[in-house]
Amino acid sequence: VTSITLNLANPTAGQYSSFVDKIRNNVRDP
């Protein structure tokens, strides 16, 4: 849980891009 929190608090560019892509996919295909 701690590592996940740290990743959310300090996401790398790659992690952020992947996160955004997942959201966009969810919006397109709910």
Curated annotation (Swiss-Prot):
Where, by tissue, is this protein expressed? Expressed in seeds.
Q: What is its EC number?
A: 3.2.2.22
Q: Which UniProt keywords apply?
A: Hydrolase, Plant defense, Protein synthesis inhibitor, Toxin
State any single GO MF term: toxin activity
Name a biological process GO annotation: defense response
User: Taxonomically, which superkingdom?
Assistant: Eukaryota
Q: Which residues cross the membrane?
A: none
Catalytic activity, as annotated: Endohydrolysis of the N-glycosidic bond at one specific adenosine on the 28S rRNA
For whether the record's keyword set contains Chaperone, the answer is: no
Provide the function of this protein: Exhibits N-glycosylase activity. Catalyzes the release of one adenine from a ribosome. Acts as a ribosome-inactivating protein and inhibits protein synthesis in a rabbit-reticulocyte lysate system and in various cell lines (in vitro).
Q: What family does the Swiss-Prot or TrEMBL record give for this protein?
A: Belongs to the ribosome-inactivating protein family. Type 1 RIP subfamily.
Kindly provide the name given to this protein in its UniProt entry. rRNA N-glycosylase
Please name the taxonomic classification of the source.
Eukaryota, Viridiplantae, Streptophyta, Embryophyta, Tracheophyta
